[in-house]
C-alpha cells in the first residue's frame, strides 16, 4: 500500500477520495487550510492532519518532508465558478501559485513517485458534443483559466523532473458533504428545508454528473497503473443531465412533484449548454466503470443531515 498525501483532503472531493483510499488500506495524510473544507471530513487522526495553506511554500515543503509520501494527490483549489469570477486574484493565487508550491515540494522530496493534479472540464471550450482529452482547450471563465495554467505547470514540472504526472479533468461532481452551492446540493438544501417550489437559475444546461465515490475509485485506479510520463484523463460518467432532469430525480425519490421558479440572480451571464465527457481513455487504461447513478445518489443525499 502507498503512503498518500492529499491536498484539499478535508473538502468535498478530497474527503471522498481519502475515505476511499483509507478503506483500501493506504497510509493517508491530509493538508488543508479549512477555508472551504471541514476537519471532521478528513479521515485521518490529528497527527496526520496538517492545517496549512498551499500559498505558503515553506509550510507545504514541511508537510511533504514530514509525511514522505509515495503519491501526492493535489486537489486543493478554489473551484466554485461564480466565486472565482468575483475573486480572480485569489483564485489565481491559490490555483496557480499554490500548485507551483506543491509541485516544487514534490521535486524536493525523493519519496514522491507519482503526482495526481486535479483539473476540470472547464478548460474546454463551449461545444455541443462529448469531449475527449485530445480536444483543444478554451476556457470561458476564471476558474477554467486558472486550471489550464495548473495543467501547464504540471506538464512542465513532469517534463523537467521526470515525475510521473496524471492530470484529471473533473466533470460535475456530486455526492455527500458538498461545500459549495452547486446545483445538486442547492436542490438538496431547498428540498430538505421543506420547499416544494425551487428557486434555480437556467434550467436548460446539461452536465455530466459523476458521484464522488466513482471519482475516488477512478483516481486510485489511475495511480495503481503506475503510468509513466504525463497523461491527461477525463473523469466523468459519460451521461449528461439537464437541470430539469436533476429536479425530476428528486421528484422520483420524494414521490411528490416540485415546482421550479427561475431566479434571474442565479442565471449565469456566460453559460455552457452542454458539458459531456468522453471517458473512453480512462476506461481503456484502467478498466474502471462508474457504479453510482443519479437516482441512487439523490436517495442518499435526501437522507443526509445538512445545515439548512
Labelled PLM ranges:
Residues 58, 70, 82, 89, ...:
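Residues in well-ordered alpha-helical elements
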Residues 22, 64, 103-107, 155, ...:
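A structural alpha-helix within SAM-dependent methyltransferase catalytic domains
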Residues 129-130, 142, 148, 152-208, ...:
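NAD(P)-dependent short-chain dehydrogenase/reductase
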Residues 192-308:
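C-terminal substrate-binding subdomain of Rossmann-fold SDR/epimerase-dehydratase oxidoreductases
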Residues 38, 81, 125, 175, ...:
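Generic structural signal for helix capping and beta-alpha/helix-loop junctions
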Amino acid at each position: 500500500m502507498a503512503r498518500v498525501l492529499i491536498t484539499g483532503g478535508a473538502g468535498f472531493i478530497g474527503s471522498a477520495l481519502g475515505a476511499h483510499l483509507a478503506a483500501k488500506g493506504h497510509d493517508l495524510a491530509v493538508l488543508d487550510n479549512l477555508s472551504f473544507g471541514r476537519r471532521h471530513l478528513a479521515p485521518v487522526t490529528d497527527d496526520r492532519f496538517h492545517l496549512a495553506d498551499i500559498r505558503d511554500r515553506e509550510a507545504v515543503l514541511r508537510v511533504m518532508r514530514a509525511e514522505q509520501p509515495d503519491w501526492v494527490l493535489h486537489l486543493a483549489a478554489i473551484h466554485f465558478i461564480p466565486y472565482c469570477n468575483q475573486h480572480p486574484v485569489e483564485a489565481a493565487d491559490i490555483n496557480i501559485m499554490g500548485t507551483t508550491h506543491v509541485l516544487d515540494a514534490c521535486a524536493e522530496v525523493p519519496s514522491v513517485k507519482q503526482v495526481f493534479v486535479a483539473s476540470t472540464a472547464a478548460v474546454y471550450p463551449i461545444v455541443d458534443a462529448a469531449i475527449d482529452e485530445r480536444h483543444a482547450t478554451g476556457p470561458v471563465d476564471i476558474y477554467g483559466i486558472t486550471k489550464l495554467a495548473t495543467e501547464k505547470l504540471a506538464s512542465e514540472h513532469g517534463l523537467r523532473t521526470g515525475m510521473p504526472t496524471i492530470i484529471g479533468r473533473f466533470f460535475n461532481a456530486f455526492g455527500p458533504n458538498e461545500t459549495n452551492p452547486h446545483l445538486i446540493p442547492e436542490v438538496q438544501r431547498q428540498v430538505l428545508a421543506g420547499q416544494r417550489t425551487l428557486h434555480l437559475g437556467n434550467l436548460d444546461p446539461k452536465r455530466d454528473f459523476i458521484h464522488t465515490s466513482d471519482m475516488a475509485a477512478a483516481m486510485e485506479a489511475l495511480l495503481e497503473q503506475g503510468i509513466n510520463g504525463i497523461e491527461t484523463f477525463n473523469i466523468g460518467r459519460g451521461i449528461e443531465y439537464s437541470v430539469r432532469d436533476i429536479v425530476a430525480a428528486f421528484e422520483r425519490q420524494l414521490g411528490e412533484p416540485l415546482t421550479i421558479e427561475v431566479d434571474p440572480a442565479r442565471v449565469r451571464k456566460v453559460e455552457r449548454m452542454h458539458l459531456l465527457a468522453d471517458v473512453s481513455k480512462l476506461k481503456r487504461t484502467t478498466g474502471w466503470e462508474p457504479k453510482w447513478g443519479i437516482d441512487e445518489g439523490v436517495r442518499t443525499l435526501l437522507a443526509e443531515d445538512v445545515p439548512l
